[in-house]
Amino acid sequence: KLLKKLAPYLVGVTLGILSFIPFTRQTTIASFLTGFGSNTVNQWNYFLDYGSESQNMWQRAYVSLLGLLPSASPEVIYLSASVDDNGDGLVGNCEYTLNGVVPKARYWSYAIYGNDNYYLQDPNNLKDDPTYEDLFAQVANGHELTTDIGEKYEIKIGNNFINQEGSLSHFGNDFNLILRIYGPDLIYYDDPSLIPVAKILKGSCK
C-alpha cells in the first residue's frame, strides 16, 4: 500500500530528473526540444529571438541554463559553436584561432564557456564568489580588436592567455564559444547566412 501511494511521487521525480538532464549541457536532445541547434551558419548555431513570448518551456529552461540575457530581437543575436572547422569538438589540449570579419553591429564580443555552461576561471586564481569583472576577463570584446565594420580580426584561444587583450583562455578545459552581436543590422534577420561568423582553426595540440 505504501509503495502504491509513493509510486506517483517517484514517477514524478524520475521524470523531472530525466527531463532536466538534457539541459545540463548542449546536447542533441536539448537542441531538438528547443530548436536552438536546428539553424546554423557553418558550425555556428543561432536562434534569432531568445526573448520571444512564444518560447516553449524547453527553450526558456535552456536560455536560463546558458545564462544568456533573453533580449528580444532586434536587440541581440547569439551564436554558439562547440566544434572547429573540421567538425572536431573544442578541446582543452589544443590551441585555436578565430578568424572573422567585424559584423554590422553596435557592439560584438566572444565569450568562452566550459561544457557545464559556466565561465572558465584561472585554476591558479580560483574564486568561490567571482565578481562580474573576474568573469568578464574571459570575454574578448570587439573594441579591443577593431571597430571598423568589415575589417578582419584574429583571436587566439589557448591554455592561459588571460593577460593578453583580444584572446580567450580555456585553461585546459573542453569548451564552447558564444558570439554575441548587439544592435545587429536587420539584414541578418532577413538572411542569417550573411552573419559573418568566424572560422575556428585548430592549432597545436599537446
Predicted regions and their residues:
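A compositional/structural signature for long, glycine/proline-rich flexible linkers
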Residues: 1-206
